[in-house]
Amino acid sequence: MSERTTEEWSRVAVSLPGWRWMPGMRVRNGDVRQWGTLAAVHPDGHVDYWDPEFEELLTGKHPSWLDIDPDDPATAGCLLALLGPKVTVYDYGDYADEPGENGKRFRVVVYVGSKGEPASWPPRDCSSLGRACIAAAEALGRWPGGES
């Protein structure tokens, strides 16, 4: 299986039930090549994000136009929160900048049910923590920590 692009990972993430935008996520608006940071999420669904191209805080009426950066550490933290408290993260790198044996470094396992069974096994090996979080949510079919 070939590695997905950043945009493909983003589309998978935002398409799953339980998804919600969170301040601190690194985002990009469509064709803009530079990444900005999500600053606020309003109750009506609008989002404010810092756009480095215009060097100002913009309000987006259509957050579905935004891509998230699955390789950004702050975004990965938000994705972990969306998975909820019953997760285990496996890091197979020896050092912070080294991948695991197969070039993939992270696995995330979500546990469900009263006995704490893994939602899917085996977990998918991914090159970043954010991608591993998205893969775990995709295997589960939802973001359990994002549901009310």
Regions from the language model: what does each represent?
Residues 1-4, 113-118, 134-148:
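Short intrinsically disordered terminal tails
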Residues 26, 31-126, 145-148:
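N-terminal segment of the canonical double-stranded RNA-binding domain
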Residues 2, 12-14, 43, 58, ...:
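Intrinsically disordered, low-complexity regions enriched in Ser/Pro/Gly/Gln/His and often acidic
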Residues 125-136:
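Short Cys/His-based metal-binding microdomains
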Residues 1-38:
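Extreme N-terminal leader/activation tails
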